[in-house]
A protein has these predicted regions:
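Short, contiguous clusters of charged residues that form electrostatic/catalytic patches at enzyme active sites
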Residues: 1-5, 91-95, 116, 165-168
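Alpha-helix termination/capping residues and helix-transition junctions
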Residues: 9-12, 57, 103, 176
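Short internal alpha-helix immediately C-terminal to a glycine-rich phosphate-binding loop
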Residues: 1-38, 96
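Adenosine-nucleotide cofactor-binding segment
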Residues: 36-116
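Glycine-rich phosphate-binding loop and adjacent beta-alpha segment
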Residues: 38, 46, 55-56, 74-78, ...
Length: 181
């Protein structure tokens, strides 16, 4: 909850686009539902096409299968041939996102895999947007091309579930049956 509503000025609003890693898992499916409740557009990243219907049923606008791309893991040394290959795939992934956002970069990236996805998250979030992270399920050694961070004024924000007020707000959504835990 805090990841999407607790880090001003990057607070989820109607019409915003949010990329959600692991959209069929516990954290991801919760984030998809929060986006739907807020009127935002969740683009869920999945690892298997069999998970698409579930993610869409939770309220995602679209899904993208990460296995169709090869831009995962720690970022290769900048300007190396491996880096250039990585960036070609990251651009391809960004274009796949644009197919669902009318050519716009995402406002927020809901990040929890960490090591395998952070470089791509920082690349695809919009200028002035936020990558918000609450875990490192694929590892804790985060790499990125810092030029995309400072030249495009992006924010990387650490987070966790919620403070007492935010927990109460999240619980209220469940009591109102607007979220399915």
């Amino acid at each position: 909850y805090r990841m999407l509503f607790g880090h001003r000025p990057h607070v989820l609003r109607p019409g915003q686009n949010v990329l959600i890693w692991g959209a069929s898992g516990g954290l991801g499916s919760y984030a998809v539902q929060l986006c739907a409740v807020a009127g935002a557009n969740a683009i869920g990243v999945i690892s298997d096409d069999s998970k698409a219907d579930f993610v869409l049923s939770m309220g995602a606008k679209a899904v993208i299968n990460r296995n169709n791309f090869k831009c995962w893991g720690q970022l290769p040394k900048v300007n190396s041939p491996e880096f250039n290959d990585y960036m070609k795939e990251a651009r391809k992934f960004g274009k796949a996102i644009w197919q669902h956002t009318n050519g716009k970069d995402v406002d927020i990236v809901f990040e929890h895999p960490g090591e395998s996805t952070m470089p791509t998250s920082v690349f695809v979030v919009k200028r002035g947007g936020m990558v918000v992270i609450c875990a490192g399920t694929t590892g804790f050694n985060l790499t990125m091309d810092a030029r995309f961070l400072w030249m495009r004024q992006k924010r990387v924000q650490g987070s966790h579930f919620a403070n007492l007020l935010q927990a109460s707000q999240a619980n209220q959504l469940m009591l109102e049956r607007r979220l399915d835990p």
